[in-house]
Amino acid sequence: MIEADRLISAGGTQVEEVADRAIRPKLLEEYIGQPQVRSQMEIFIQAAKLRGDALDHLLIFGPPGLGKTTLANIVANEMGVNLRTTSGPVLEKAGDLAAMLTNLEPHDVLFIDEIHRLSPVVEEVLYPAMEDYQLDIMIGEGPAARSIKIDLPPFTLIGATTRAGSLTSPLRDRFGIVQRLEFYQVPDLQHIVGRSARFMGLEMSDEGALEVARRARGTPRIANRLLRRVRDFAEVKHNGAISADIAAQALDMLNVDAEGFDYMDRKLLLAVIDKFFGGPVGLDNLAAAIGEERETIEDVLEPYLIQQGFLQRTPRGRMATVRAWNHFGITPPEMP
């Protein structure tokens, strides 16, 4: 199983990136959820504009699909500057980064997605650029090689990562602003789904938006993906109108249950409950029982189940919680 193949995967595709671009909020006043991030960024941006400075470098981290790219776009729009976008894996050589930096206008935003995947050579170039707005470049090779300094205009680097712990300390310490995006609450997701439905020209009730939001695993990207599939169902089965009942029927047909679990989530939980009496069960045994790689369980399946309180990691192995038993209508065993 590949994470990208799952309807409830938080990872995005190129097609979704294009589709989502049209419905993304452009300004902070349109930004839904993340109230602490929103209020802090409003202050930081206004202060930078009052001083006539570039915004401090910004690190955004958190699970995939929560709007790191959206926030970077909003920052550039609020500052009234250009946004240049790239990603860690694309910047293979120091020259790749140097080319982007030397093309920036004053106060522009350079957005590097997956910044934790920068190579050490490229990262070294970033240090003086972030700290002193200078590039140190080596010209020539061998004994004739010499270093030259190129002045850069003041700019803002926005780095995005799902793995803040993978950043080196020297890089992490150069960000003046650090923001963590949290999973969204259902009311905020309902608002996002309703807004997206209006942009897509859909007839959708508040209850229909709530049904999609409940199953979106706290993630706007998943919410918008589910909305598109519910739209397809509604257009074929119900003349396009989306009620709570139609949304529920569509998502049930797609095997996304009331908790946002798909077939693989349920398969894992039921294996722990049925085959191992609720656990504890070792990771290798669990992987063999459901026919998956242990890395898939650790990196793809487990995190959301643990976050939502359906699965526990213990020193002796994985255990299903009482909430997991109740989800399937099975009476949990009495604790000794």
From Swiss-Prot:
GO terms for biological process: DNA recombination; DNA repair. GO terms for cellular component: cytoplasm; Holliday junction resolvase complex. Residues 185-255 are annotated as: Small ATPAse domain (RuvB-S). Its main location: cytoplasm. GO terms for molecular function: ATP binding; ATP hydrolysis activity; four-way junction DNA binding; four-way junction helicase activity. Keywords: ATP-binding, Cytoplasm, DNA damage, DNA recombination, DNA repair, DNA-binding, Hydrolase, Nucleotide-binding. Residues 4-184 are annotated as: Large ATPase domain (RuvB-L). It is an enzyme of class 3 (hydrolase). ATP binds at I23, R24, G65, K68, T69, T70, E131, D132, Y133, R174, Y184, R221. The lineage of its organism: Bacteria, Pseudomonadati, Pseudomonadota, Gammaproteobacteria, Enterobacterales. DNA binds at R294, R313, R318. It holds the Pfam family AAA_lid_4. It comes from Citrobacter koseri (strain ATCC BAA-895 / CDC 4225-83 / SGSC4696). This is Holliday junction branch migration complex subunit RuvB. Its EC number is 3.6.4.-. InterPro entries: AAA+_ATPase (IPR003593), AAA_lid_4 (IPR041445), DNA_helicase_Holl-junc_RuvB (IPR004605), P-loop_NTPase (IPR027417), RuvB-like_N (IPR008824), RuvB_C (IPR008823), WH-like_DNA-bd_sf (IPR036388), WH_DNA-bd_sf (IPR036390). It catalyses: ATP + H2O = ADP + phosphate + H(+). Mg(2+) binds at T69. Belongs to the RuvB family. Has 3 domains, the large (RuvB-L) and small ATPase (RuvB-S) domains and the C-terminal head (RuvB-H) domain. The head domain binds DNA, while the ATPase domains jointly bind ATP, ADP or are empty depending on the state of the subunit in the translocation cycle. During a single DNA translocation step the structure of each domain remains the same, but their relative positions change. It comes from the Bacteria. Homohexamer. Forms an RuvA(8)-RuvB(12)-Holliday junction (HJ) complex. HJ DNA is sandwiched between 2 RuvA tetramers; dsDNA enters through RuvA and exits via RuvB. An RuvB hexamer assembles on each DNA strand where it exits the tetramer. Each RuvB hexamer is contacted by two RuvA subunits (via domain III) on 2 adjacent RuvB subunits; this complex drives branch migration. In the full resolvosome a probable DNA-RuvA(4)-RuvB(12)-RuvC(2) complex forms which resolves the HJ. PANTHER family: HOLLIDAY JUNCTION BRANCH MIGRATION COMPLEX SUBUNIT RUVB, PTHR42848. It is found in: Cytoplasm. The keyword DNA damage applies. The RuvA-RuvB-RuvC complex processes Holliday junction (HJ) DNA during genetic recombination and DNA repair, while the RuvA-RuvB complex plays an important role in the rescue of blocked DNA replication forks via replication fork reversal (RFR). RuvA specifically binds to HJ cruciform DNA, conferring on it an open structure. The RuvB hexamer acts as an ATP-dependent pump, pulling dsDNA into and through the RuvAB complex. RuvB forms 2 homohexamers on either side of HJ DNA bound by 1 or 2 RuvA tetramers; 4 subunits per hexamer contact DNA at a time.
